[in-house]
């Protein structure tokens, strides 16, 4: 199959997180539209994290996330992706770390297959 150079430099990827809720850690899943960043950017972020260098995960998440699906509010209504909604999501403890880790794993698997 031929590689198609797409104009849309993003990809959808499932995210699974476990967040404290009523004395348990139920799994929550949704889909995130990640930006395809340069190889250098991805390597820099991954290397810093692997080397224990502090990384502003909220700032990274804001750079790499372009949208989402399957996120709802308390009443079950779909939450549209906006910068303000992303800020709200990133205020949840551990969320930025989970989102960045998922992006790194998704891009690493692509590199492994090539």
Predicted regions: what they are:
Residues 24-28, 37-114:
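Short, surface-exposed, charged amphipathic helix/loop patches that serve as local interaction elements
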Residues 1-49:
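Short, charged/polar N-terminal "headpieces" of proteins
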């Amino acid at each position: 199959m031929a590689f198609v150079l797409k104009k849309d430099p993003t990809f959808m990827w499932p995210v699974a997180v476990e967040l404290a809720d009523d004395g348990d850690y139920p799994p929550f899943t949704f889909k995130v539209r990640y930006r395809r960043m340069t190889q250098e950017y991805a390597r820099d972020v991954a290397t810093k994290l692997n080397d224990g260098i502090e990384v502003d995960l909220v700032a990274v998440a804001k750079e790499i996330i372009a949208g989402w699906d399957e996120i709802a509010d308390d009443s079950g209504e779909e939450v549209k992706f906006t910068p303000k909604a992303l800020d709200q999501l990133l205020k949840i403890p551990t969320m930025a770390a989970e989102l960045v880790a998922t992006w790194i794993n998704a891009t690493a698997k692509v590199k492994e297959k090539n």
